[in-house]
UniProtKB/Swiss-Prot annotation:
Subunit description: Homohexamer.
Cell compartments where the protein resides: Cytoplasm
Taxon lineage: Bacteria, Pseudomonadati, Pseudomonadota, Alphaproteobacteria, Hyphomicrobiales
Alphabetical keyword list: Cytoplasm, Hydrolase, Magnesium, Metal-binding
Name of the protein described by the UniProt record: Inorganic pyrophosphatase
Superkingdom, taxonomy of origin: Bacteria
EC number annotated for this UniProt entry: 3.6.1.1
InterPro entries per the UniProt record, alphabetical: Pyrophosphatase (IPR008162), Pyrophosphatase_sf (IPR036649)
Amino acid sequence: MRIDAISIGKNPPDDINVIVEVPVGGHPIKYEMDKDAGALIVDRFLYTPMTYPGNYGFVPHTLSDDGDPIDVLICNTRPLVPGCVINVRPIGVMIMEDDGGKDEKILAVPAPKLTQRYDKVHNYTDLPEITLKQIEHFFEHYKDLEPGKWVKMGGWQDVDVAKKLIVEAIERYKTQG
């Protein structure tokens, strides 16, 4: 896969593309896309036997404060094939920090052309509270048993903050990527 050939989206930050690395409900394995080779590699086996609460990936042509493309958790119930590209719209962001520094997770839903299931979801607050708690629980604990790793949760922010972080990550990629 040539990652450089995949667009950010049709209208960022409102409409973005995500390259999926880990499927919802998959085995406790963290995959990452090798951006240079365009290949999906095994980053690590999670020490904690937990599954991802959504399809997880990144927005191409972005750069977060941690030096990686901006992370996205897609709220949907069907597992996507790692390496596929899905068009989504952001609905919020979970602020967190880990042993590597700031590590925000953009929360998104599939674009309306893919499914009508999320037509009324415009902000993270439109999701069921249990869904948000499950996401928080996963990211708060998925590194618990890994030596030297830690996570600190900073709470949820709305869609406007998510879009601002996406724009900043796009600009950072243009100047530093």
